[in-house]
Amino acid sequence: MNQFKVISKFNPTGDQPKAIKSIAKGIEKREKFQTLIGVTGSGKTFTMANIIEKVQKPTLVLAHNKTLAAQLCSEFREFFPNNAVEYFVSYYDYYQPEAYVAQSDTYIEKDASINDEIDKLRHSATSALFERKDVIIVASVSCIYGLGNPEEYKKLTISLREGMEKDRDEIIKKLVEIQYERNDIDFSRGTFRVKGDVLDIFPASSSSKAVRVEFFGDEIDRIKEFDVLTGETITKLKHISIFPASHFATSKDRLEVAIKDIEEELEERVKELVSQDKILEAQRLKQRTNFDIEMMREVGYCTGIENYSRVLDGRAKGTPPQTLLDYFPQDFLLFIDESHVTLPQVKAMQAGDKSRKDSLVEYGFRLPCAYDNRPLTFKEFENKLNQVVFVSATPAKYELEYSTNTAEQVIRPTGLLDPEIIVKPVKGQIDDLYTSIQETIKRGFRILVTTLTKKMAEDLTDYLKEMGVKTRYLHSDIDTIERMKIIHDLRKGEFHVLVGINLLREGLDIPEVALVTILDADKEGFLRSETSLIQTVGRAARNSESKVIMYGDVITKSMEKTIKETNRRRKIQMEYNEEHGIVPKTIIKDIREVIQISDIAEERKEYDNLNEALKSYNNDIDKLIEKYEEEMKEAAQNLQFEKAAHLRDVIYKLKKDKETEL
């Protein structure tokens, strides 16, 4: 078995060794809940990696959005190049859930666009858990949604070994059962093709490698892994496991039992609706469910099969769905990153799902078993946990209340101090802000300004622009790519001041920022709570010359606690710096490194000029498609999904153009 091994040119320093030892010891002592309190820039991810190396447990890292999960996944892949580091997030690029609006008698059918690359990564994650122990999966809250039965998934796995006596047609039949499709022309993920005694299988967890099984009579003669694009053999295999092409794949026997259960539930529910004088609803439910049953009998699945997942799994009514957590061995470790944001997200998921299902069940669009295709409730989530480490600079009440051990990581290896906090009166705050901005710009740094309302942010942006200050406003309507472009431009000095309401989201740890100002800091509320203030102050913690100005006429409890906590952290870091002779120095990261997503728009222009590209390839459209396919796969492997998706669209256009020419 492969062991977790951190590969890094750095060794743990500052508070890291103490935190690693404390948390690892707690895990060995079977502590269920622990908290790692780590300030911005203290190297929490590196600490997490070292804890994983120490305890050697399969690990799930839970992040609160896809972007943060992708960042963490990239970092863990750097630390663990020889171990399986996987990415598991929602595979929907676009998702419109099924719903019924009774007031207007409007039925909204489920509409979704599935990202094929993310689906591949999800399959890669689940199959890795069955194949090895040294697995780290970085996931979003998508991991608390129903995923199909892991026991059934494992049972349906096809195991092929060199020299094994196996009928080719029997394997083909099994492949169809686990939802692989035969396609001798378009050989893609989740398909297989047959030519004489040769069976090629394109696993659901792969994007560029397929498996060739060669038969001699009823015996498997050879198994090879080959490159789908070139056809070249990569390696010869003694054994291969082919995992199902869908997490909801079900054996024929189980499906027959499930169909009987669905028919019984349908009969019961129809009687119930008729007794309530809901004749239309009863007829609708009968028609829709019978169609689904027919599809399941014919092809093994139907659209919206997840709504029958409880019946397919053979679970009792009201029992929790099987999720990614059930695919892990019992002795797994869970890190909840930015737990103060992630845990409330987990808590909120189930309520929204239930309210939508109520009308679907009531008006005869779905059977009541659809209720059990849902995210876990928070209580169910807790019950599935083994050992948890909450990671946050500002852990909430839940984390601190339940944790039996807390490790603090205040010292930054760079020696950087938490910024100095200055409180100034509200009267004349705009004039004072303008003066402070000018001083900071003269020193060559940038400024973040956080306001309480959208109106104030817009007015302040207009005012500063009128005063000749290069200013931009960051608001919630801006999409991810545009948002990242704004931060990229701020770092490059295209403008100097960024105004916003909530500047706490990831990606705003900008070393060039030397001034963070908080307007109306004394207005208690969500945006001026202790957690929000500490997080906002942290935005200035990447620069050795930074400071924070809070504008307020009174010092609220939240302000007082924030100032006290920041001063405590400054004192600890100053003592450490003095003891070790460290002079705090701003670490200026390469701009491309922090914000890879921002150049996608530029890269798109390059790919959109197809006429120029074709000229450079002597109008050989096939060669250009081949080049773009390689680049698309490389982008996807590097988690650059926007670039990969755009390349996919360009390839599709080229293929269409080729067909037109023919």
From Swiss-Prot:
Its main location: cytoplasm. The keyword Acyltransferase does not apply. GO terms for biological process: nucleotide-excision repair; SOS response. Residues 429-595 form the Helicase C-terminal domain. InterPro entries: Helicase/UvrB_N, Helicase_ATP-bd, Helicase_C-like, P-loop_NTPase, UVR_dom, UVR_dom_sf, UvrB, UvrB_inter. Keywords: ATP-binding, Cytoplasm, DNA damage, DNA excision, DNA repair, Excision nuclease, Helicase, Hydrolase, Nucleotide-binding, SOS response. Residues 622-657 form the UVR domain. The beta-hairpin motif is involved in DNA binding. Pfam families: Helicase_C, ResIII, UVR, UvrB, UvrB_inter. Residues 25-182 form the Helicase ATP-binding domain. The UvrABC repair system catalyzes the recognition and processing of DNA lesions. A damage recognition complex composed of 2 UvrA and 2 UvrB subunits scans DNA for abnormalities. Upon binding of the UvrA(2)B(2) complex to a putative damaged site, the DNA wraps around one UvrB monomer. DNA wrap is dependent on ATP binding by UvrB and probably causes local melting of the DNA helix, facilitating insertion of UvrB beta-hairpin between the DNA strands. Then UvrB probes one DNA strand for the presence of a lesion. Belongs to the UvrB family. This is UvrABC system protein B. Coiled coil: none annotated. It comes from the Bacteria. Forms a heterotetramer with UvrA during the search for lesions. Interacts with UvrC in an incision complex. A motif (Beta-hairpin) lies at residues 91-114. It is found in: Cytoplasm. The lineage of its organism: Bacteria, Bacillati, Bacillota, Clostridia, Eubacteriales. One of its GO terms (molecular function) is ATP hydrolysis activity. PROSITE patterns: HELICASE_ATP_BIND_1, HELICASE_CTER, UVR.
